[in-house]
Amino acid sequence: MSVSTIAAERRTIQLAIDTGVIALRGLSPQRSRFELEYALERGSTANSVLFAAGDVEPAVLVHPPGAAYSSVFLPVLAEQLADADQALLVVVGHVNPNRVALLRDLAERYSKLELIASNAGAKVLAELWTQRKPAPPGQEVEQPPLPDL
């Protein structure tokens, strides 16, 4: 199965936990039996929690997925947080290049994005933030600045 076919089959579902608390679970039919496949080291799902506090307090997003889920995750998040000027705190539990790519997308959309990470995580975030694949001459893309940590 091609990478584009697998990506097209991914989706993000919303599970209301309580008023203002929403679980955003990224699913793939290729990984529908999470516990068994995880035990066999064949993959996992992407599970995030959004605390939407309303207009007064910032929203808090815990453990956003990596870029592999960006095409299905970002539109669902935008439904919940339509105001791009709303403050958004993002708790980053583990850092890798795939996750940093999605965080860059969030930084482009939400101008008041703040990242929350451990000291070690913040150092890795700062190093990975500016890394990118080389672009052909004349096709360089401006990246958003690293949000406050």
Model-derived regions: residue spans:
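Short, low-complexity, polar/charged sequence segments that are solvent-exposed and flexible
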Residues: 41-45, 79-83, 109-112, 134-138
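Active-site metal-binding motif and surrounding structural segment of the metallo-beta-lactamase
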Residues: 65-116
